[in-house]
UniProtKB/Swiss-Prot annotation:
<feature type="binding site">
    <location>
        <position position="305"/>
    </location>
    <ligand>
        <name>substrate</name>
    </ligand>
</feature>
<protein>
    <recommendedName>
        <fullName>Alanine racemase</fullName>
        <ecNumber>5.1.1.1</ecNumber>
    </recommendedName>
</protein>
<dbReference type="InterPro" id="IPR011079">
    <property type="entry name" value="Ala_racemase_C"/>
</dbReference>
<dbReference type="InterPro" id="IPR001608">
    <property type="entry name" value="Ala_racemase_N"/>
</dbReference>
<feature type="binding site">
    <location>
        <position position="130"/>
    </location>
    <ligand>
        <name>substrate</name>
    </ligand>
</feature>
<feature type="active site" description="Proton acceptor; specific for D-alanine">
    <location>
        <position position="35"/>
    </location>
</feature>
<comment type="pathway">
    <text>Amino-acid biosynthesis; D-alanine biosynthesis; D-alanine from L-alanine: step 1/1.</text>
</comment>
<dbReference type="GO" id="GO:0005829">
    <property type="term" value="C:cytosol"/>
</dbReference>
<dbReference type="InterPro" id="IPR020622">
    <property type="entry name" value="Ala_racemase_pyridoxalP-BS"/>
</dbReference>
<dbReference type="InterPro" id="IPR000821">
    <property type="entry name" value="Ala_racemase"/>
</dbReference>
<dbReference type="GO" id="GO:0030170">
    <property type="term" value="F:pyridoxal phosphate binding"/>
</dbReference>
<comment type="similarity">
    <text>Belongs to the alanine racemase family.</text>
</comment>
<keyword id="KW-0413">Isomerase</keyword>
<feature type="modified residue" description="N6-(pyridoxal phosphate)lysine">
    <location>
        <position position="35"/>
    </location>
</feature>
<dbReference type="GO" id="GO:0008784">
    <property type="term" value="F:alanine racemase activity"/>
</dbReference>
<dbReference type="InterPro" id="IPR029066">
    <property type="entry name" value="PLP-binding_barrel"/>
</dbReference>
<dbReference type="Pfam" id="PF01168">
    <property type="entry name" value="Ala_racemase_N"/>
</dbReference>
Length: 373
């Protein structure tokens, strides 16, 4: 028998989250962002649930080709554009939309001799200072793109740096509107946080990412409470050992946890080689939460490569074989991430290939049935 650890990708949750996003931005078309292999969920696993989107956004040409192989005929956006002149031929062959964010990409496009018409999204740097043309150079970049015979539609695009914070998006919208004034073309501004909290930024296209998968753009689950968003990934395992500790006994490498009273702990078949964060806290004031037999408890000690330990005080009936939820439905991934000094995005993307993953599928009655993927 294999180790009991396994992950589940919940297609009904993905479809639910897409519906909620549609309700938040009813006048906008949706790029479902599936970069990083759908934030670790797997493009193959999420495709059926997200094909109601208007397009898919990603980074990798191979992932774009995979979507075409899965039967997707709609738009696919390369969010970082292309990296070599020869990529333009692949973009043309597979009918991809590409971002253009720098002079080098414009030069490559000019020299590629594509037949077109190519759909491009010209990226404006409104303050993120990562990718995009500065406002003073944007109109010139647009005119260069417009003059290329291979270029068809041009969408104006930017990315928000503070849509999930008190600073907000007003300053970036102002810069965007000033730089694109009197230029024809649709606009795409909103990331997940702007979809939820800044309707003035929705425009023609929105680009939700993390909220498709049921986690919070801020890293705080409380911030999406009441939205109806559901976690699309659950990570489960079982107890493989139970230990009885006496006061003064320590747990794990570095002896970071010391028992202050007689207590039982459980050993879970999950470690950092499975994608669980080694820096998850099992000592001090904020210990990482875990569910054992559906009961909330906490980590004790340091996470090892293949195992971690949990306090069984709240779970007196727990024994070897008791089910454990590391994150997912019933335990928000953002809570685990907060206790690990990171964000839910990272935990999703870090799920290790060695973890068997199944799919809870969408059936005709909208009920979930597990299927291995």
């Amino acid at each position: 028998m294999p180790r009991p650890i396994h992950a589940v990708i919940h297609q009904p949750a993905l479809a639910n989250n897409l519906d909620i996003i549609r309700g938040k931005a009813p006048e906008s078309r949706i790029w479902a962002v599936v970069k990083a292999n759908a934030y670790g969920h797997g493009i193959r696993r999420v495709f059926a649930a997200l094909r109601g989107a208007d397009g898919f956004g990603l980074l990798d040409l191979n992932e774009a080709v995979l979507l075409r192989d899965l039967g997707w005929q709609g738009p696919i956006l390369l969010l970082e554009g292309f990296f070599q002149p020869q990529d333009v031929a692949v973009i043309e062959q597979y009918r991809l939309t590409t971002a253009i964010h720098c002079d080098e990409q414009l030069r490559m496009l000019e020299s590629a001799r594509a037949k077109g018409p190519l759909a491009i999204q010209l990226k404006l740097n409104t303050g993120m200072n990562r990718l995009g043309f500065h406002p003073a150079a944007y109109r010139t970049a647009w005119e260069r793109a417009r003059a290329m015979p291979c270029v068809g539609s041009i969408v104006h695009m930017t990315h928000f740096s503070d849509a999930d914070s008190a600073r907000g998006v007003a300053h970036q919208i102002e810069a965007f509107d000033a730089a694109t004034a009197n230029l024809p073309g649709e606009a795409s501004l909103s990331n997940s946080a702007a979809v939820l909290w800044h309707p003035q930024a929705h425009r023609a296209w929105v680009r939700p990412g993390i909220i498709l998968y049921g986690a919070s753009p801020t890293g705080r689950d409380a911030d999406i409470a009441g939205t109806g968003l559901q976690p699309a990934m659950s990570l489960h395992s079982e107890l493989i050992s139970v230990q009885d500790l006496q006061p003064g006994d320590t747990v794990g490498y570095g002896s970071l946890f010391t028992a202050e009273r007689p207590m039982r702990i459980g050993v879970v078949a999950c470690g950092y080689a499975d994608g669980y964060p080694r820096h998850a806290s099992g000592w001090g004031e904020q210990r990482a939460p875990v569910l054992v037999d559906g009961v909330r408890t906490e980590l004790v000690g340091r996470v090892s490569m293949d195992m971690l330990c949990v306090d069984l005080t709240p779970c007196p009936k727990a024994r070897v074989g008791s089910p454990v939820t590391l994150w997912g439905q019933g335990l928000p991934i953002d809570e685990v991430a907060q206790a690990s000094g990171t964000v839910g995005y990272e935990l999703m993307c870090a799920l290790a290939p060695r973890v068997p993953t199944s799919v809870a599928t969408i059936t005709a009655s909208d009920s979930a049935a597990p299927a291995v993927a």
